Amino acid sequence: MSSFRLDVVSLVPEVFDSLRGLGVIGRAFHAGIAELHTHNPRDYATDRYRKVDDEPYGGGAGMVLKPEPVFAAFEAIPVQPSRRVLLMTPQGKPLQQADLRRWATDYEQLVLLCGHYEGFDERIRSLADEEVSLGDFVLTGGELPAMTIINGTVRLRPGTVGTADSLVEESHSAGLLEHPHYTRPATFREMDVPAVLRSGDHGAIARWRAEQQKERTQLRRPDLWAQWQAEHPGNEG
């Protein structure tokens, strides 16, 4: 399998350096499972001041990211056979685990476009295949959403995480939240590990974990629980 290529267009590319040394994600980069490239639109500005923003037409507060340097940075990126271009914007579709899995599985290259300032020139949207948001809130730029996508996709690539089972069992992988985890000691400050987990009965443990997943999802994320029930008709939980 070829290396998973990630290209980020950002005015602050240095913030992505930390990912190269971040736990299993950093090891994936060092092992060649994934590769990270950053592209600063300022390097493609053509005026003497390397200007990348300007006042909005029609007036208004703030500055708008200009299209020319962004397009130039984007067009300088090598194109892989299977590529997806993602625009970070609060107007985008809220990020879901299914999106991360799809991008990590179906594509060999992701290009992440990060806005800044008040916003970006509307014509920049034409570069993107999808627009992505972390939620209904606004940040100063698209770098944190981009870092989230990088982390979330690289960890799903084969060879990054030690065992595939750990990916299957975690929250959202099957539409439910993950079950509780415990480790030693068996008792800590009068809080005990459930006896079933110490019983050695693997069938009972599996049933307990499945019930915990359902209970947690129903209590903490009723929206996910309703969706799971709709996808599993006849299951009473």
From Swiss-Prot:
GO BP annotations, alphabetical order: tRNA N1-guanine methylation
The keyword Methyltransferase is annotated on this UniProt entry: yes
Gene3D superfamilies recorded: 3.40.1280.10, tRNA(m1g37)methyltransferase, domain 2
Primary location group: cytoplasm
Residue positions binding S-adenosyl-L-methionine: 115, 134-139
Highest taxon above the source species: Bacteria
Places the protein is found: Cytoplasm
Keywords on record: Cytoplasm, Methyltransferase, S-adenosyl-L-methionine, Transferase, tRNA processing
Record note on quaternary structure: Homodimer.
Name of the protein described by the UniProt record: tRNA (guanine-N(1)-)-methyltransferase
Encoding gene (name): trmD
